[in-house]
Amino acid sequence: MLDERARTLLKTLVEHYVADGQPVGSRALSKFSGLDLSPATIRNVMADLEEAGFVASPHTSAGRIPTARGYRLFVDSLLTVQPLEARQMGEMEEALHGRPAGQIIASASQLLSSLTHFAGVVIAPRRQSSRIRQIEFLSLSEKRILLIIVTADGDVQNRIVTTDKVYSPAELVSAANYLTQNFAGLDFEQIRHRLTVEIKQLRDDIKPLMALALDAGDAAMAENTTPYVISGERNLLDVEELSSNMKRLRELFDLFEQRSSLMRLLEISNSAEGVQIFIGGESGIATLDECSVIAAPYTVDGQVVGSVGVIGPTRMAYERVIPIVDITARLLSSALSYKSDN
């Protein structure tokens, strides 16, 4: 446990290093910390902080810089978050509200990027959870059927399925009516769960068609999904700590393109409350060892459906980025919930 003197010096060091990117020496700490300490005492305290893993000494400088552990202590117990100005919040709200539903996710990603000058990312609501209004089957040939799905928000998805047997038009109408009458208002996951309970009530010849319809419906909805939108990746080219290592920078852009690892990280915030902060190696992704990820969940009608985040260097103004991510998540929730009600 650090004493108050050490905590004050660490806070001062982090703030100054974030501001100008240069290692912080004892003279600057003496000037800006507000502590009446001799240079020798400050050097001793800094040596203790370095031994404890909170700061490090670059080989080319007598000053020190924060480590990931130092940033973590700073964020957890030393940080004073700066509330956003009313004017800026108004501009953020205007950027998201009043747009077509399909543009809101992309706008949120661009908003995060433009405000932080890092990469902004949004995991979109999964379309598989769209509620179903109507399902129809249309025979194309003996064993090829067109599945037509109409969602509650008016989207229409089509999928061709191949069956093992020939279904008559009457059987297709019967199966479609059964699904529509019994499962309208549910998503495919809920329908699948209900059918596992009610499967005994179905005729044996209809059961395979129901299974095909569910699988095809899931696939059709997934294909029309853009689950991940990222903006401002090029901003990271201007971050000296990242751009100085081209190999690591290429790996970072590969991570953005592959998506799956980053999506899994961001989805962790879906099950947590408020803003989640991953500093350096805390992400569990080696490519992000020199980065921080700030993420928060957003909701539609009170249900968590995705997350927003900012990816940047560990040297970032956390007191500013954290509220930007938090407010963006809240405004996105409001904008999407409004769309779902209209």
Curated annotation (Swiss-Prot):
Biological function: Negative regulator of class I heat shock genes (grpE-dnaK-dnaJ and groELS operons). Prevents heat-shock induction of these operons.
Keywords: Repressor, Stress response, Transcription, Transcription regulation
Example GO molecular function: DNA binding
Protein name: Heat-inducible transcription repressor HrcA
Gene Ontology biological-process annotations: negative regulation of DNA-templated transcription
Family: Belongs to the HrcA family.
Cited Pfam families: HrcA, HrcA_DNA-bdg
InterPro entries to which the protein is assigned, alphabetical: GAF-like_dom_sf (IPR029016), HrcA (IPR002571), HrcA_C (IPR021153), WH-like_DNA-bd_sf (IPR036388), WH_DNA-bd_sf (IPR036390), WHTH_HrcA_DNA-bd (IPR005104), WHTH_transcript_rep_HrcA_IDD (IPR023120)
NCBIfam families according to UniProt: hrcA
HAMAP family linked to this entry: HrcA (MF_00081)
Taxon lineage: Bacteria, Pseudomonadati, Pseudomonadota, Betaproteobacteria, Rhodocyclales
